[in-house]
Curated annotation (Swiss-Prot):
Additional information: Armillaria species are both devastating forest pathogens and some of the largest and oldest terrestrial organisms on Earth. They forage for hosts and achieve immense colony sizes via rhizomorphs, root-like multicellular structures of clonal dispersal. One genetic Armillaria gallica individual localized in Michigan's Upper Peninsula stands out as exceptionally large, covering hundreds of tree root systems over approximately 75 hectares of the forest floor. Based on observed growth rates of the fungus, the minimum age of this large individual can be estimated as 2500 years.
Keywords in alphabetical order: Glycoprotein, Heme, Iron, Membrane, Metal-binding, Monooxygenase, Oxidoreductase, Transmembrane, Transmembrane helix
Cofactor: heme
Species the sequence originates in: Armillaria gallica
EC number: 1.-.-.-
Pathway(s): Secondary metabolite biosynthesis
Domain of life, per lineage: Eukaryota
Topology of this chain in the membrane: Single-pass membrane protein
Glycosylation site residues: 455
Name assigned to this protein: Cytochrome P450 monooxygenase ARMGADRAFT_1018417
Transmembrane segments: 3-23
A GO molecular-function descriptor: heme binding
UniProt: heme binding residues: 433
Length: 518
């Protein structure tokens, strides 16, 4: 009996440190930014909503300040909502905050070959350097011909099949990037490259949305528990290889046949420093960044114009005064279209493409605003909270393009703009969107064309003959900020505008020809 008691005592003494260690898991360490109270083991995981994470982060920012912390099990999450904190953490300390968090899902699906989700490594730096050479502000001038031509087809598609306006925007965004990247375009919204990409992207976005799947990177043992996400990953691995690998193979076969059109992959296939894995990683990053963001913006842009006819009329009057009625607008006109520029910026402010952006990850401990940012912390830029802050914006939930006519940031007089960036919609630091200039050109061209060619109105209910209302607050917001389905009418402004849209599309066929040779 005495021997048993001795063993029990020894066992208890050995277990005490283990129990104390387990109880410390999930607790907020000293020196971290403040945040909501935690529970042992889980930290703040139990407080995460199934949807609307950006709203919860914004509510916590109001309570705990412009930088706060969360505990996801043993892991630390830092959320920066104030521009000052974002600038210091993401821009000024970019040498140690440019990594991406470990992503089991991404690794299983891509084998590590995705520049957008790649760790801060030589692989990422090589891919970023090659993509940057294709997408500098100067290099993007060379892509304008394709962007204009594809935008001409977009207007024609709106003209002849307006009810499919969402699909037309997806076709445009997809075809522009595949033409420049892989030398092949999509002439119709049902073209295989379009349908395959957006179906795959829908599943990919859902899988990566925080809260939509088990946090296997924060709680590793969860990856061994059966779940539907494993079947989704296996399916997506095949789909991504078929899509991106197929694009690379198709380009290589054209080159072998002596057919070239100057696309990006043609040069890189002959670059001995670029292997297939890096090519695939660049294809996925450019496709996912270029196709999704532009098509989502177009949906929000159309919704805002339908809901605010007075804004549409004012923007149209400005375009008419600068462009006239005998030609389509062009990118050079943007310097003389301050109100149109303000409309574009206000769409991006009110409904940023991503509410939280892709998370960063710290590789070294840092100190920001007197708080410790530990090594291996996941870092979110709360773009939604930043762009909807009532201390910075008058009526932040209202669509008011005029705010950008009096401030480059759209902020109200007296607002603290320290650290604020005009390019926050594209991310920050060394991970800022490599296609930013290309994307800005696409948004400008398509926005000008739409306002110039069409009057966007509410659809008419065939039963009541009354306008069908739209609601600018009806959005599905997960990883991306996407309007829920809505109806509208595209009314071409005149027979002359119709003729010019048709002529522009006819002339664009010469531009399309080299990209329709598969």
């Amino acid at each position: 009996m005495a021997l048993f008691s001795a063993y029990a005592l020894a066992f208890s003494l050995l277990m005490i440190p283990l129990i104390l260690y387990i109880l410390r898991i999930g607790r907020r360490e000293s020196g971290l930014p403040p945040g909501p109270s935690t529970l042992p083991l889980v930290g703040n995981l139990h407080q995460l909503p199934h949807g609307g994470l950006h709203l919860q982060f914004t509510a916590w920012a109001k309570e705990f300040g412009g930088i706060f912390s969360l505990k996801f099990g043993p892991g630390t999450v830092i959320v920066a909502t104030s521009p000052r904190a974002v600038r210091e953490l993401i821009d000024q300390k970019s040498a140690s905050t440019s990594d991406r968090p470990p992503s089991h899902f991404s690794n299983v699906i891509t084998g590590g070959n995705n520049i957008g989700f790649a760790r801060y490594s030589d692989y990422w730096r090589r891919g970023r350097r090659v993509m940057h050479s294709m997408l500098t502000k100067k290099a993007c001038v060379n892509h304008l011909t394709i962007q204009r031509a594809e935008a001409s087809q977009l207007m024609y598609d709106y003209l002849v099949e307006p009810k499919e306006f969402v699909a037309h925007g997806q076709r445009y965004a997809n075809s522009v990037i595949t033409s420049i990247l892989a030398g092949t375009r999509s002439p119709h919204h049902t073209s295989p490259l379009v349908t395959a990409f957006f179906q795959m992207q829908h599943e990919w976005t859902h899988l990566l949305t925080p809260g939509a799947h088990p946090p296997v990177d924060m709680v590793p043992f969860l990856k061994y528990i059966p779940g539907s996400w494993k079947q989704i990953c296996a399916k997506m691995k095949v789909s991504q290889e078929e899509l991106y690998g197929g694009m690379i193979d198709a380009c290589a076969k054209r080159v072998e046949r002596g057919i070239r059109n100057g696309c990006f992959l043609e040069g890189e296939l002959e670059n001995k420093d670029v292997d297939r894995g890096l090519l695939r990683g660049m294809c996925s990053a450019l496709m996912e960044g270029g196709s999704d963001s532009t098509s989502i913006y177009l949906q929000s842009f159309i919704l805002m114009l339908v809901a605010h006819p007075e804004v549409q009329a004012k923007a149209r009057a400005e375009i008419d005064s600068v462009v006239g009625l005998d030609r389509l607008p062009d990118i050079e006109d943007m310097d003389n279209l301050p109100y149109v520029s303000a409309v574009i910026k206000e769409v991006l402010r009110l409904r940023p493409i991503t509410a939280l952006g892709a998370p960063h990850y710290s590789t070294q401990p840092e100190v920001v605003d007197g708080y410790v940012i530990p090594k291996n912390s996941m870092i979110f830029m709360n773009q939604w909270g930043m762009l909807h802050d009532p201390d910075s914006y008058d009526q932040p939930e209202s669509f008011m393009p005029e705010r950008f006519l009096t401030s480059p940031f759209g902020t109200k007089p007296g607002a603290d703009d320290t650290g604020r960036s005009k390019d926050i919609y594209f991310g920050g630091g060394r991970r800022i969107c490599v296609g930013m200039h290309f994307g800005q050109n696409s948004l400008a061209i398509t926005s000008m064309y739409l306002i110039w060619a069409f009057n966007l109105t509410n659809a008419i209910d065939p039963q009541t003959k009354n306008p069908i209302p739209v609601d600018i607050n009806e959005y599905d917001i997960s990883l991306n900020t996407i309007p829920k389905p809505f109806k509208c009418d595209f009314q071409v402004r005149s027979e002359e505008h119709k003729r010019m849209v048709e002529n522009a599309f006819a002339e664009a066929r010469q531009v399309f020809a080299p990209f329709e040779q598969d």
